[in-house]
């Protein structure tokens, strides 16, 4: 029969030494299904010199291979002799690659680290969120939860079409732990909430239900509802790791995929994979957005207008709320609202990111945690494969390049009104396309008909179009028809990609050439803006901030520049007010009182909540009132309250995610000392845990006085002056560039005290 299938994801397994590829799909009747490919074999390429037959014989002696074929392929644009080496299973490629790399006559090995399912999707140009038409046979195979199972006979065509209605849910759960560092062996899940198109479902701890039953009911719900997409808001890849470890400790398997027996497991990019379903980490999507400083669910949902601002509960306080039966409904409602926000946020992001999935070819769950560099490279591999270009193996590259400093004016520190932000990232894209800069056009010898960089004299062939130019032109053509923000972001990120030293096609010459040529054009553009009556107050690699003149005049100038230099400059944002503190350190107020903060708060994750909040309020006050004195009063008021004991202990806790083994950390870091104290007292603190600590009074260095937060019950034990110093130090990072001295900020008089109580009078 001939049927059409909408692709969700790919996976594979080995049966009887035969790799089976599963194309998880929705068929043209709306059924969840799996299409099984039985005939595709893993392979890689070897570039050789000398006697090909002898080399083939040596490969066969060293490796268990299925087939070796002599082929012609391209490497960096040049046709080369190569061997296509097929193996029986994907795992044999790595073993074979290591053995044959030492054989005489073998120059290089290519395509050997491309995932098996990605190789298949590239060769047949199958991309998630697109359709394919195929000859298939419906079969009854055990081991699947999909409604239909098909054996693939032949792919007939592939095309883009309407996305079918996908079943999606948002998930949130809360954990009971009195000691902050969550231990899946002992800390139960007290409430688990789900939200879907049909509404809510919640399971919670009570006399009739322990968390073993919660987990079982959760598994049953997923299997019965059968979602195509599961949305999570998974900071530090925490949720799935915890729930799987908790389930294992209770003797339960989280077997919720469409392949029976395939448990939730960690995949290629660090995400947790669920067979046949897309497990999408929304934090991963948001953290890869430029200028997105929010990773808090409530803040980002409010910022995007998805759900209103609401109160947040600290995860380490859940046990306190749960112990008070009057507050249990508060925890339940909080978790339910989280699940709803996650579901709505997921659907909000689905539309733009589905476009990116089609272009890059990564399933949405993998794309959600892949960096922009990995996204670009996945797409570049597809472009290269179309022209039979060999794919280099990724490896560490010590041959670093240094970027040319492209900030062509010193930032004008201060507070500004009505600032236009111009996106100039098209300068780099234009340079790459205009000068055909690419690894396969780079000429290291003599060349009489090449483009040449301005400083280092790097040469690039004018014809044919290189890999990078071809890739960017393909994206540009797509963008012309779809006007997608995420495609635009993908193109803008290409500059960072060419400077990524661990990319497959990294070249110091290319990175330097793009820097040299784009610097010259960027300087001409900025000079033209300044000479047209606008004031340039900040310019970095991607953005130029200008003020003065009308919007119409600026649009006319942009049109002129784009025509003159073949660029695509555009106004990205308009700030009602803008605070500039240095290179790439700024904050802006948009319409609707939305605030962007860039780099000012980059180091804030190592601060306690109170200091972070005061620092943000200082920035907000400056942007809204443009009154530095009010911001100073805000800091002084916070200091007074801190010294008066008007705070919650939880506000002073500093939280750290432990990403490595303790042996890899400096022993004198406060969180390491606090964690060791907790371990010595019998608490489980390990890699991937979170530790919260407080600095207490006493003698010795600060790190020696770091205590796990659950050791500190009274406020009078806390070293308040440590936190006052931290508050002042962080506030001065914002206020000092605006003319506020440390001495004046520390000085507190009677007026400051009266201001705190609203008792001083303005005259």
Curated annotation (Swiss-Prot):
InterPro entries: DNA-dir_DNA_pol_B (IPR006172), DNA-dir_DNA_pol_B_exonuc (IPR006133), DNA-dir_DNA_pol_B_multi_dom (IPR006134), DNA/RNA_pol_sf (IPR043502), DNA_pol_B_thumb (IPR042087), DNA_pol_palm_dom_sf (IPR023211), DNA_pol_type-B (IPR050240), RNaseH-like_sf (IPR012337). Its EC number is 2.7.7.7. One of its GO terms (molecular function) is DNA-directed DNA polymerase activity. It holds the Pfam family DNA_pol_B. It is an enzyme of class 2 (transferase). It comes from the Archaea. It catalyses: DNA(n) + a 2'-deoxyribonucleoside 5'-triphosphate = DNA(n+1) + diphosphate. Gene3D superfamilies: DNA polymerase family B, C-terminal domain, DNA Polymerase, chain B, domain 1, Palm domain of DNA polymerase, Ribonuclease H-like superfamily/Ribonuclease H. Signal peptide: none annotated. GO terms for biological process: DNA-templated DNA replication. Keywords: DNA replication, DNA-binding, DNA-directed DNA polymerase, Nucleotidyltransferase, Transferase. Belongs to the DNA polymerase type-B family. This is DNA polymerase 3. It comes from Saccharolobus shibatae (strain ATCC 51178 / DSM 5389 / JCM 8931 / NBRC 15437 / B12) (Sulfolobus shibatae).
């Amino acid at each position: 029969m001939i049927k059409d299938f909408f692709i969700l994801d790919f996976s594979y397994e080995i049966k009887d030494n035969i790799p089976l590829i599963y194309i998880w799909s929705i068929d043209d009747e709306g059924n969840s299904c799996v299409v099984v490919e039985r005939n595709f074999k893993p392979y890689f390429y070897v570039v050789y010199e000398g006697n090909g037959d002898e080399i083939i014989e040596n490969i066969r002696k060293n490796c268990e291979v299925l087939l070796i074929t002599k082929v012609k392929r391209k490497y960096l644009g040049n046709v080369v002799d190569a061997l296509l080496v097929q193996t029986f299973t994907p795992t044999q490629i790595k073993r074979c690659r290591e053995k044959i790399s030492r054989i005489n006559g073998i120059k290089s090995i290519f395509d050997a680290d491309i995932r098996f399912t990605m190789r298949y999707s590239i060769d047949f140009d199958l991309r998630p969120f697109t359709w394919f038409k195929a000859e298939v046979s419906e079969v009854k195979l055990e081991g699947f939860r999909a409604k239909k199972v098909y054996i693939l006979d032949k792919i007939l065509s592939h095309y883009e079409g309407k996305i079918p209605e996908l079943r999606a849910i948002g998930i949130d759960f809360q954990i009971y732990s009195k000691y902050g560092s969550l231990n899946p062996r002992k800390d139960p899940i007290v409430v688990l909430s789900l939200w879907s198109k049909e509404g809510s479902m919640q399971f919670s701890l009570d006399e009739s239900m322990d968390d073993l039953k919660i987990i079982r009911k959760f598994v049953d719900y997923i299997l019965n509802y059968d979602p195509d997409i599961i949305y999570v808001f998974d900071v530090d890849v925490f949720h799935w790791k915890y729930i799987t470890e908790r389930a294992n400790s209770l003797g339960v398997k989280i077997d919720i995929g469409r392949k029976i027996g395939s448990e939730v497991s960690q995949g290629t990019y660090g995400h947790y994979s669920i067979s046949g379903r897309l497990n999408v980490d929304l934090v991963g999507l948001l953290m890869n957005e430029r200028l997105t400083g929010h990773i808090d669910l409530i803040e980002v949902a409010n910022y995007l207008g998805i759900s209103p601002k609401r109160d947040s509960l600290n995860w380490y306080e859940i046990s306190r709320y749960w112990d008070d039966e009057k507050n249990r409904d508060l925890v339940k409602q909080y978790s339910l609202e989280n699940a709803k926000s996650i579901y709505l946020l997921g659907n909000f992001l689905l539309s733009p990111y589905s476009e990116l999935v089609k272009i890059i070819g990564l399933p949405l769950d993998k794309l959600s945690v892949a960096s922009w560099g990995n996204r670009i490279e996945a797409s570049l591999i597809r472009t290269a494969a179309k022209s039979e270009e060999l794919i280099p193996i990724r490896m560490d590259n010590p041959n670093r390049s240094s970027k040319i400093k492209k900030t062509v004016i010193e930032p004008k520190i201060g507070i500004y009104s009505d600032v236009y932000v111009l996106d100039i990232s098209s300068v780099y894209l234009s340079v790459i396309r205009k000068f055909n800069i690419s690894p396969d056009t780079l000429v290291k010898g003599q060349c009489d008909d090449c483009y040449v960089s301005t400083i280092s004299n790097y040469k690039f062939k004018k014809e044919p179009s290189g890999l990078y130019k071809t890739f960017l032109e393909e994206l540009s053509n797509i963008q012309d028809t779809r006007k997608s923000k995420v495609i635009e972001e993908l193109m803008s990120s290409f500059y960072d990609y060419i400077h990524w030293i661990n990319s497959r096609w990294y070249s110091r010459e290319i990175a330097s050439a793009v820097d040299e040529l784009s610097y010259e054009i960027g300087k001409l553009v900025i000079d033209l803006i300044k000479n047209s009556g606008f004031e340039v107050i900040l310019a970095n690699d991607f953005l130029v901030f200008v003020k003065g003149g009308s919007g119409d005049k600026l649009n006319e100038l942009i049109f002129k520049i784009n025509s003159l230099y073949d660029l695509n400059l555009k106004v990205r944002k308009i700030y009602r007010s803008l605070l500039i503190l240095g290179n790439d350190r700024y904050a802006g107020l948009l319409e609707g009182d939305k605030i962007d903060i860039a780099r000012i708060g980059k180091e804030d994750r190592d601060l306690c909540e109170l200091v972070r909040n005061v620092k943000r309020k200082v920035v907000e006050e400056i942007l809204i009132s443009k009154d530095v004195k009010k911001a100073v009063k805000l800091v002084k008021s916070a200091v007074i309250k801190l010294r008066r004991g008007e705070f919650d202990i939880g506000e002073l806790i500093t939280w750290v995610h432990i990403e490595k083994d303790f042996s890899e950390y400096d022993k004198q870091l406060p969180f390491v000392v606090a964690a060791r104290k907790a371990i010595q007292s019998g608490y489980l603190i390990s890699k991937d845990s979170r530790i919260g600590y407080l600095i207490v009074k006493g003698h010795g260095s600060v790190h020696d006085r770091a205590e796990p937060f659950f050791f500190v019950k009274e406020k009078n034990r806390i070293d308040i002056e440590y936190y006052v110093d931290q508050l002042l130090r962080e506030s001065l990072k914002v206020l000092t560039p605006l003319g506020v001295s440390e001495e004046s900020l520390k000085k507190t008089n009677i007026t400051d005290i009266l201001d705190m109580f609203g008792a001083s009078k303005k005259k």
